[in-house]
């Protein structure tokens, strides 16, 4: 029963982290989670340790557990590892893919084409941007499956989950504050890069597939780091204003 309850607690907390219910830095209180999930505290503690091993949670003595909060250096390192693994996986996919694999890779791409075209002629809505983000992940995971390397696939999936958590504040901020033209341009760029990756894999050109994936993740890293730097500056500015208000009072 302990193992079952640990799995239940693990799945519950993991899903809430991935949905963004528990954002980066959110305190994960063992007693409150146990009551929320309907299990004892022991399986919750075990679940949090598993999530720490996954890279989604950090546990500090006397401070307890929190959803992992990534700084720019950690985010860069994670993207660099993604680049190395996913570029290699794309090359393997070009070599090992089947007709069925190509259909699985193209399916999310078709959805992204449709939504991107819709966004050109309508107001940008968060629901559509979220759908694109989900199809983006589906596209990448289909490529990983086509590589036929199970170990690489598991590690890339883990990195995608970490990336999703690390990107939560960046993505929300982008949706809320970026001009419509910038959002559309970003979607167009991502779609173009995905088209290039798919075309290379479909053609069986491993070298081109690796280059296309490398370029895609390098662009993602550059844009994301720029947004993270902007957010850090905004947080510092807000902190200075708060300190000034306290001092003035």
Could you describe each region identified by the protein language model?
Residues 1-95, 151, 226-237, 241-249:
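Short linear motifs at protein or domain termini
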Residues 73, 78, 88-90, 99-173, ...:
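Conserved amphipathic alpha-helical segments that form helical-bundle/coiled-coil interaction surfaces
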Residues 169-249:
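C-terminal all-alpha effector/ligand-binding and dimerization domain
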């Amino acid at each position: 029963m302990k193992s079952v309850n640990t799995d239940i607690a693990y799945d519950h907390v993991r899903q809430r982290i991935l949905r963004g219910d528990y954002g980066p830095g959110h305190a994960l209180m063992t007693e409150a989670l146990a009551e929320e999930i309907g299990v004892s505290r022991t399986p919750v503690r075990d679940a949090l340790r598993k999530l720490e091993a996954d890279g989604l949670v950090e546990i500090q003595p006397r401070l307890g557990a929190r959803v992992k909060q990534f700084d720019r250096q950690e985010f860069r390192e994670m993207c660099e590892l993604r680049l190395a693994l996913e570029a290699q996986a794309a090359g393997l996919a070009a070599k090992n893919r089947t007709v069925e694999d190509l259909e699985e890779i193209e399916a999310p791409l078709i959805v992204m084409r449709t939504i991107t075209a819709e966004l050109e002629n309508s107001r940008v809505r968060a629901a559509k941007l979220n759908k694109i983000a989900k199809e983006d992940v589906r596209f990448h995971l289909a490529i990983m499956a086509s590589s036929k390397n199970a170990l690489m696939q598991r590690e890339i999936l883990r990195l995608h989950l970490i990336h999703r958590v690390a990107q939560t504040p960046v993505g929300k901020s982008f949706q809320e504050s970026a001009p419509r033209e910038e959002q559309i341009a970003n979607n167009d760029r991502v779609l173009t890069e995905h088209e290039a990756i798919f075309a290379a894999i479909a053609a069986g050109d491993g070298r081109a597939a690796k280059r296309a994936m490398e370029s895609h993740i390098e662009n993602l890293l550059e844009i994301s780091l720029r947004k993270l730097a902007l957010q850090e500056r905004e947080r510092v500015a807000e902190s200075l204003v708060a300190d000034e208000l306290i001092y003035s009072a």
